[in-house]
Amino acid sequence: QMCIRDRCNVGGITESMKVAGWCESHYIDMMPHNPLGPICTAASIHYGASVPNFAWLETRESSAENAGFFDDEIIQSSHKMQNAMYVVSDEPGLGIKVNEDYLKNSKFKQWDPPQLERNDGSVTNW
């Protein structure tokens, strides 16, 4: 069995670790949902290194998928994939540096993700 959950939806790294503890007591492995680029990836790598039942990490490292998410001009990350896995960085914090000057001079484009509803009207993930 596998628990696939998103740190953003569950309340952050601390709450994710609590979910992992509950899952571990039921012999369920963790596979973090990782859809949001290099900052989310860095947090996921550190989370994976901190829980004993971490199994896999969803990632967007293919050239067809990354769509600029891993642009070194915007975010410098010490996390690089090696032999189909990430090595945990010894850099402080999450091991990333955000180029704030680049972002200040960039144009912001608002985007709202689709909000899907089930037949009964309840909200669901997309």
Language model: regions and residue ranges:
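Flexible C-terminal active-site loop/helix
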Residues: 38-126
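A contiguous pocket-lining binding segment that forms or flanks enzyme active sites
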Residues: 31-33, 46
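Short glycine/serine/threonine/alanine-rich loop segments
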Residues: 27-28, 53
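Short, small-residue-biased leader/transition segments that mark boundaries at the very start
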Residues: 2-4
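Active-site-adjacent beta->alpha loops and helix N-cap segments on the catalytic face
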Residues: 10-22
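Short, acidic/turn-prone active-site loops that include or flank metal/cofactor-
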Residues: 7-10, 61
